[in-house]
């Protein structure tokens, strides 16, 4: 492989452009990387983005489970009233004066705040699979087969997000 480096020098006094060429032979084998050889780092933000895609396709106005009157999951992360109550309980334990209302589930910023409060309280050191499966299935969600299917959907979205 031959590498040609061509630096350009511009003199500010005469505004002349001069070219200086260097040739250097670099002997290195070309290494072909396979997808399994490349470690993809998935961030917490990637996880949240994937959850939003699975839950609502990014629709802040989404309403799911309409058959559960009064307990519908709504917003980008499909938050149920029980989750709002849980987040408010956590805030009370943390001696915070902040409280969320049901309508806050339609607000992307507040939805994300609620998610992180829940996650940091219950899943500070959990892996992404446990977080996703519990988000979908509740406190013991990681044990349910239905949440394993959910996790596969999240993984598929993560794969799409990390191929950039």
Regions found by a protein language model. Give the residues of each.
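Small-residue packing motifs within transmembrane alpha-helices
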Residues: 2-3, 46
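Bacterial Sec-dependent signal peptides at the C-terminal "C-region" and cleavage site
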Residues: 3-23
């Amino acid at each position: 492989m031959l590498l040609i480096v061509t630096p350009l020098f511009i003199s500010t006094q005469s505004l002349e452009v001069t070219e200086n060429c260097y040739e250097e032979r670099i002997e290195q084998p070309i290494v072909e990387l396979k997808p399994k050889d490349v470690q993809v780092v998935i961030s917490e933000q990637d996880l949240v983005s994937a959850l939003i895609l699975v839950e609502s396709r990014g629709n802040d106005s989404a309403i799911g489970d309409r058959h559960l009157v009064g307990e519908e999951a709504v917003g980008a992360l499909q938050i149920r009233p029980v989750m709002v109550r849980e987040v408010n309980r956590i805030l009370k334990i943390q001696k915070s004066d902040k409280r969320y209302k049901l309508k806050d589930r339609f607000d992307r910023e507040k939805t994300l705040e609620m998610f992180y409060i829940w996650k940091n309280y219950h899943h500070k050191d959990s892996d992404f699979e446990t977080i996703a499966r519990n988000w979908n299935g509740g406190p013991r969600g990681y044990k349910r087969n239905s949440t394993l299917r959910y996790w596969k959907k999240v993984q598929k979205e993560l794969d799409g997000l990390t191929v950039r």
